[in-house]
Regions:
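Cytochrome P450 C-terminal beta-domain/meander region
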Residues: 292-300
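Surface-exposed recognition segments
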Residues: 204-207, 233-236, 299-375
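Bulky hydrophobic/aromatic "packing anchor" residues in well-ordered structure
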Residues: 188-190, 216, 264, 337-338, ...
Length: 375
C-alpha cells in the first residue's frame, strides 16, 4: 500500500467537504437555464455530467469500497457496494467515458443529481463522525475534498470561457516593479516531505536536484509588460481587444480596461516562451521556481505559471489508489505548471510543491508566467 496520509481531523474534513459543496452549488445556482449541458468543448465538461462525476467520485472512494480487496486489484475496477444512483459507474466514471461521450450519456435532471449529492455528502459526514480514527477513511475524504475543489476551479474556467456572469469577482494583486532574484549554483529538494500530510502521488518524494546559477523574475509578467511586447509585434491573448490606443480584456461577461499591474493570464506556453525569447530570457524549470519561491522577495500572482518542464514522474514514482490522477498524463504532451494556485484554487492546494499540468496550447486556465535566465 502506498504511503497515504491526512493530518486533518474528522470534524475539519467534514466542514471542508461541506464548504467545497457550497462553492460548487453557488456556481450551479448561477448557471443559465440552458447551461447544464452547454456546447461541446474539448477542454470543458458538461456541467450536469461534471456535478454528477464529483458526487460519484466521493461515493466511490468514501462509501462504496469493500474490505478485503486484493492488493493488486484496481480500486476503479474492483467490485463495489451499490451506488445510490442507478447506472452511476456507467455514467460518471471518467476513466471509462470518453470526453466527447459525456454530452451523449443520459443523465438525471439537475435536481435529482444535486439531491444525490446531498445524500452522499451527508453519508460521508456521518461515516467520519463514526469512524474518523480510520486513517484510510480520512485520506480518501481528503482526496475527494481536493478533487471537488479542482472541479470547482474547472467550473470557474468554464465561466470565463463561456462569458458567463460569475457569482463573485476575482481579487488579483497589483504587482509592483521588482528586481529579479539571483541564485548561485546549488542543490534543491524537489518534491514533498514524507511527514507533511496529504500529497498527490506526483509530488512524492523530496529528492535533490542540482541547479546551475540562474536569475528569475520576482513576480509574474504583468498585463502592461505584455502589452508593450504586443506593441512590438507579439501576439495578444485571445481575450484582449484593441480599445483606442490601448487594450481591453474580457473578464467573464464584461469587457474592462486592461488592468496594467495585474498578472497577464490566459496565455499558452508558446506565447509565454515567445515573450521570454523576445526578452532574451526563457521560462524557469520547476526546480528553479520551487527554490525561488522560498525567497522573501518572491511574489505570487494568484495565477498558475508555466514552466519549461514536461510533466514527468519523480524518481521511484508509484501510483496512489487513484491511479489515473497522474500516470496517464506522463505522456510527454503535458507541461508542468507551478504557481501555488490561482485566485480560485482552494487554499489547501496553494503550496509551492503542488504540481499542476496542462497541455501547452491551453489558454483557458487562469495561467500566466515569469521569466528566467542562466547566469
Amino acid at each position: 500500500m502506498p504511503n497515504l496520509s491526512s493530518t486533518l481531523p474528522p470534524d475539519t474534513l467534514a466542514e471542508a467537504l461541506e464548504a467545497a459543496r457550497a462553492r460548487l452549488d453557488a456556481l450551479a445556482d448561477g448557471l443559465p437555464e440552458d447551461g447544464w449541458l452547454g456546447p461541446y468543448a474539448p477542454t470543458l465538461n458538461p456541467p450536469l455530467w461534471e456535478y454528477g462525476h464529483v458526487v460519484w467520485f466521493q461515493e466511490h472512494w468514501c462509501l462504496r469500497q469493500k474490505p478485503g480487496r486484493a492488493p493488486d486489484e484496481s480500486p476503479l475496477t474492483a467490485p463495489l457496494a451499490d451506488s445510490r444512483m442507478d447506472w452511476a459507474d456507467w455514467r460518471y466514471n471518467s476513466s471509462r467515458i470518453p470526453h466527447a461521450a459525456r454530452w451523449q450519456v443520459p443523465l438525471p435532471a439537475p435536481g435529482a443529481t444535486r439531491a444525490w449529492g446531498r445524500e452522499v455528502l451527508d453519508a460521508v459526514k456521518a461515516k467520519l463522525a463514526r469512524g474518523g480514527d480510520d486513517p484510510a477513511l480520512r485520506y480518501f475524504c481528503e482526496l475527494c475534498l481536493h478533487h471537488e475543489n479542482m472541479h470547482v476551479e474547472a467550473w470557474w474556467m468554464m465561466w470565463q470561457s463561456r462569458g458567463l456572469r460569475p457569482p463573485a469577482w476575482p481579487e488579483l494583486p497589483r504587482l509592483a516593479d521588482a528586481r529579479p532574484l539571483r541564485f548561485g549554483a546549488e542543490r534543491v529538494l524537489l518534491g514533498s516531505a514524507r511527514d507533511g500530510g496529504f500529497v498527490f502521488d506526483n509530488e512524492k518524494w523530496a529528492h535533490p536536484v542540482a541547479l546551475a546559477a540562474f536569475e528569475i523574475d520576482a513576480r509574474p509578467v504583468t498585463n502592461a509588460e505584455y502589452a508593450r511586447y504586443v506593441a512590438e509585434g507579439g501576439t495578444p491573448p485571445g481575450h484582449w481587444r484593441a480599445a483606442g490606443a490601448g487594450w481591453e480584456l474580457r473578464r467573464f461577461d464584461r469587457w474592462i480596461a486592461l488592468p496594467a499591474q495585474e498578472p497577464v493570464m490566459h496565455v499558452s506556453r508558446a506565447q509565454a516562451e515567445a515573450y521570454a525569447l523576445a526578452a532574451g530570457r526563457r521560462l524557469p524549470v520547476a526546480a528553479e521556481w520551487q527554490l525561488a519561491s522560498a525567497h522573501e522577495s518572491f511574489v505570487l500572482g494568484r495565477c498558475w505559471e508555466w514552466t519549461a518542464d514536461s510533466f514527468a514522474p519523480y524518481p521511484g514514482f508509484s501510483a496512489d489508489p487513484y491511479a489515473d490522477y497522474s500516470q496517464p498524463w506522463f505522456d510527454g504532451r503535458h507541461a508542468e505548471v507551478r504557481g501555488a494556485g490561482s485566485w480560485v484554487t482552494d487554499a489547501r492546494l496553494a503550496r509551492p510543491t503542488f504540481r499542476n499540468f496542462y497541455t501547452p496550447e491551453r489558454c483557458d486556465p487562469f495561467i500566466g508566467f515569469r521569466t528566467a535566465c542562466s547566469l
